């Protein structure tokens, strides 16, 4: 009998400016192209649920689907923005997406 995969959980990754963030340059002018491509790859794989920068250029938020925190830490560790030092992981926290506007799901949705 095939062993089933553990259910996917959600984790919020908070990013902050890293040591190689160029002061005085907004996020759109930082060397984050590889970071964006990496996030696209994670989205294609089904790991990334949503992501975006904070409007004050202090960092950003990524919501990942993963088996456990170790998997999320590995994904974040290999993010080119983190590897290059432009970004740094501030925290990783378990998250429960209770209200999802994209799917219309919520604890108050009518059962179908």
What are these regions, as identified by a protein language model?
Residues 1-112:
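Conserved, structured core segments of small domains
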